[in-house]
Amino acid sequence: MIEQRPVSNLIGHLILILGIIIVAFPIYYTFVASSMTSTQIIRPPISLLPGDHLVENYREAIFGGVERVVGVSLERLLWNSFVVAMAIAVGKIIISFMSAFAIVFFRFPMRMFFFWMIFITLMLPVEVRILPTYKVIVDLGMIDTYAGLTLPLMASATATFLFRQFFLTIPGELVEAARIDNAGPFRFMRDILLPLSKTNIAALFVILFIYGWTQYLWPLLVTNDAKMNTIIIGLRRMVDWADASTPWNYVMVTAILAIIPPILVVVLMQRWFVKGLVETEK
């Protein structure tokens, strides 16, 4: 039985509350700023209570305000980010799942060599890989395309490693039973591995969706057309102006709208996400 210590519980709750405040306050501050005019935002001290221009700012930003600043509508920026994040998350999961499946359940020469070659890519800094990858994308004519934005980011050594470690815990008796039932590789993967892996897939999807949504450097390199910009690039372009000329009200509105999709993904998949991280039973 765990001994209840009121003082320890109080300290623990205070630390949690402090952590929540530290994380949530910048979001609240951004929301408050999104309800003010640009002049009010740059004139300190800014109020901690919402202003009178909340509906006006959001309406103007969504219906043309952002487009006048960066040359592309807010809806298009959000759509581009959604396409990129979904394609990267789904692509990474499919490729990593298939790679780990082949490495664990097939016996072929140098299979561990190929696994370690995949794993070693984790040691390479992004800056080392990004220039040759960019050259390939240019040569293939994939600048300003969704394929150029997503394909180079679909390979994932981390996800392959995590799936491999999970597959290694599959009982050998289960594999033998599938063989006795004449289950081929595809049927074994579809009927056994996929159901067992659903919580792991959900946890990885949350992580990889956020990874894809927050991409900045790669979209910055492979997009010249403003219509292919993601929401992160759009935000950066909005604050390229002089401080006094930056439409800070639109910036704050865009920032709030930019964090809503990742938050929704985390909230909607929270149960699966936590279960996928802690579940060990097969």
UniProtKB/Swiss-Prot annotation:
GO process terms (BP): transmembrane transport
Membrane-spanning residues: 14-34, 86-106, 112-132, 146-168, 201-221, 248-268
One GO cellular component term: plasma membrane
Protein's cellular compartments: Cell inner membrane
Domain ABC transmembrane type-1: residue ranges: 78-269
Keyword Cell membrane among UniProt keywords: yes
Pfam family name, one: BPD_transp_1
InterPro entries reported in the protein's UniProt record: MetI-like, MetI-like_sf
Major localization listed first in the record, in broad terms: membrane
Keywords associated with the record: Cell inner membrane, Cell membrane, Membrane, Transmembrane, Transmembrane helix, Transport
Entries under PANTHER family matching the protein: ABC TRANSPORTER PERMEASE PROTEIN MG189-RELATED-RELATED, SN-GLYCEROL-3-PHOSPHATE TRANSPORT SYSTEM PERMEASE PROTEIN UGPE
Subunit structure: The complex is composed of two ATP-binding proteins (UgpC), two transmembrane proteins (UgpA and UgpE) and a solute-binding protein (UgpB).
Function: Part of the ABC transporter complex UgpBAEC involved in sn-glycerol-3-phosphate (G3P) import. Probably responsible for the translocation of the substrate across the membrane.
UniProt name for this protein: sn-glycerol-3-phosphate transport system permease protein UgpE
Source organism (scientific name): Brucella melitensis biotype 1 (strain ATCC 23456 / CCUG 17765 / NCTC 10094 / 16M)
The encoding gene: ugpE
